[in-house]
Amino acid sequence: MRIIGRLPDPRMQITVFENDGRFPVQFELGGVTQVYRFRKGDGLQHFGHVESLVDETFRTGVMEQFHAMHRLHAAVNARLGGSAADDPHGDLPDII
């Protein structure tokens, strides 16, 4: 899998890959990732086609999903009695 480009967006990072006849498009925001995979075909052959596909309507839907994912993550952290911000060690393992 190789990166063929990035799409500018002030809200999130968008990376377009090419892999085995597909274009995976990865969206990242605040430690959460969404990946959508599209098969190459007549209307989808190169980066420019992917760029046209990932329009504002698509991006708005991705942002709505990110908001839902963050709400779920916050709810799970609340059930655990805190948040990741409360953990001084975060996700890092102890090094001896």
Regions found by a protein language model. Give the residues of each.
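Acidic, low-complexity intrinsically disordered segments
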Residues: 49-96
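Residue-level marker of intrinsically disordered, low-complexity segments enriched
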Residues: 1-2, 30, 48, 52
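Polar low-complexity intrinsically disordered regions enriched in Ser/Thr and small residues
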Residues: 8-9, 46, 84-85
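A short, structured beta-strand/loop element
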Residues: 21-45
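General secondary-structure edge motif
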Residues: 5, 42, 46-49
